[in-house]
C-alpha cells in the first residue's frame, strides 16, 4: 500500500476485516513513496511460496513498483485504485466486497503482461540493468538541447535521430508516455514493442512497432551530462556519449488478477473518458 494516499489506511482496515470473514490470511506491507521500496522485504522473500496474490492499494505508480518485486516470483497482483486514472487497477475502493467474493469463489483470471529488460553498456562493459512494465526512455534532461542516437533492431540498422529522446514501450506502456509522444496504442495481446522518438528534428520520423522477440539497441552519439535512461519513470541512470542501451523482453511477465468481464477496448474507452474529464 502507498502510505501517502489518505484513503489507504481506512481501506486497508476494511480489507483486513473483510478478509477475516472470507478466511483469508493477509499480511500488511507498505510501498514507500519516493524510494518505492518494500518495508521488511526480506520477510516477504522468505514467505513468497505461500503468497497466492498481492493486493496493491495505490495509483499506477505504486503498481508499477510492485511488479518489479513480485513479477520475478510469478505472484499475481490485484490493483485497487487510490490514484487518479488507475489504468492498471482492477478495482475501485467501493468494489472491495465484490473483489473478495470473486477471489473466494475462484472466479477470476490471471492475465500476463510483457515486461522489458534495459541494460546499459559502456566501453564494452555492462554498467546497469533495470526491469519495467511500461517503458524505457532515453531523455535529454533539463537542458533544451537534442540528443543524437542511432537505433538498431537485432543488429539491423534502422535510422539515426536528432531528438529530445526516445521511448521503447511494451503494449502496457503504449498507453502512457509513448501515447503522449504520438505513438500508437498496442493491444496487450500483441507481442511487440513500440519505439517512439520524442520531438524528433525531422518531418519523417514515426513510431515503429517491432516483435518483442527482437533486441533493440540504442547507440548514443552525443548527449548532455544530464541525459538519462529512465525505466517506468522510477529508475534512472546517467547516459554518456558512446553508451549503448539494449532493450529486450524480460525473462518473466507481470501477472494481474482480472475479475471483470470487460475487454481491453472497453477499459480503454473508460479510462480515456476519465482522463478527459480529469483534464477538463
UniProtKB/Swiss-Prot annotation:
Its main location: cytoplasm. The active site is at 60 (proton acceptor). Keywords: ATP-binding, Cytoplasm, Kinase, NAD, NADP, Nucleotide-binding, Transferase. HAMAP family: NAD_kinase (MF_00361). It is found in: Cytoplasm. The keyword Kinase applies. It comes from Carboxydothermus hydrogenoformans (strain ATCC BAA-161 / DSM 6008 / Z-2901). One of its GO terms (biological process) is NAD metabolic process. It comes from the Bacteria. NAD(+) binds at residues 60-61, 134-135, 145, 164, 175-180, 234. This is NAD kinase. Its EC number is 2.7.1.23. InterPro entries: ATP-NAD_kinase_N, ATP-NAD_kinase_PpnK-typ_C, NAD/diacylglycerol_kinase_sf, NADK. Coiled coil: none annotated. Involved in the regulation of the intracellular balance of NAD and NADP, and is a key enzyme in the biosynthesis of NADP. Catalyzes specifically the phosphorylation on 2'-hydroxyl of the adenosine moiety of NAD to yield NADP. Belongs to the NAD kinase family. One of its GO terms (cellular component) is cytoplasm. The lineage of its organism: Bacteria, Bacillati, Bacillota, Clostridia, Thermoanaerobacterales. Its cofactor is a divalent metal cation. It catalyses: NAD(+) + ATP = ADP + NADP(+) + H(+). One of its GO terms (molecular function) is metal ion binding.
Amino acid at each position: 500500500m502507498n502510505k501517502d494516499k489518505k484513503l489507504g489506511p481506512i481501506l486497508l482496515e476494511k480489507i483486513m476485516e473483510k478478509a477475516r470473514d472470507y478466511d483469508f490470511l493477509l499480511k500488511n506491507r507498505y510501498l514507500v513513496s519516493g524510494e518505492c521500496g518494500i518495508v521488511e522485504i526480506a520477510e516477504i522473500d522468505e514467505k513468497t511460496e505461500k503468497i497466492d496474490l498481492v493486493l496493491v492499494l495505490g495509483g499506477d505508480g505504486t503498481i508499477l513498483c510492485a511488479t518489479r518485486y513480485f513479477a520475478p516470483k510469478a505472484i499475481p497482483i490485484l490493483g485497487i485504485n487510490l490514484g487518479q486514472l488507475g489504468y492498471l487497477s482492477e478495482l475501485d475502493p467501493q468494489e472491495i466486497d465484490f473483489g473478495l467474493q470473486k477471489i473466494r469463489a475462484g472466479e477470476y483470471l490471471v492475465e500476463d503482461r510483457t515486461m522489458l529488460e534495459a541494460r546499459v553498456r559502456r566501453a564494452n562493459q555492462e554498467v546497469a540493468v533495470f526491469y519495467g512494465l511500461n517503458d524505457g526512455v532515453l531523455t535529454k534532461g533539463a537542458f533544451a538541447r537534442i540528443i543524437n542516437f542511432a537505433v538498431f533492431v537485432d543488429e539491423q540498422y534502422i535510422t539515426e535521430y536528432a531528438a529530445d529522446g526516445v521511448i521503447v514501450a511494451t503494449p502496457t506502456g503504449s498507453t502512457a508516455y509513448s501515447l503522449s509522444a504520438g505513438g500508437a496504442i498496442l493491444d496487450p495481446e500483441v507481442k511487440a514493442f513500440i519505439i517512439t522518438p520524442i520531438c524528433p528534428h525531422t518531418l519523417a520520423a514515426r513510431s515503429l512497432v517491432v516483435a518483442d522477440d527482437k533486441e533493440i539497441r540504442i547507440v548514443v552519439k552525443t548527449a548532455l551530462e544530464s541525459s538519462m535512461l529512465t525505466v517506468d519513470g522510477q529508475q534512472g541512470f546517467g547516459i554518456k556519449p558512446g553508451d549503448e542501451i539494449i532493450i529486450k523482453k524480460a525473462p518473466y511477465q507481470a501477472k494481474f488478477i482480472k475479475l471483470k468481464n470487460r475487454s481491453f477496448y472497453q477499459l480503454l474507452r473508460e479510462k480515456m473518458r476519465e482522463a478527459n474529464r480529469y483534464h477538463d
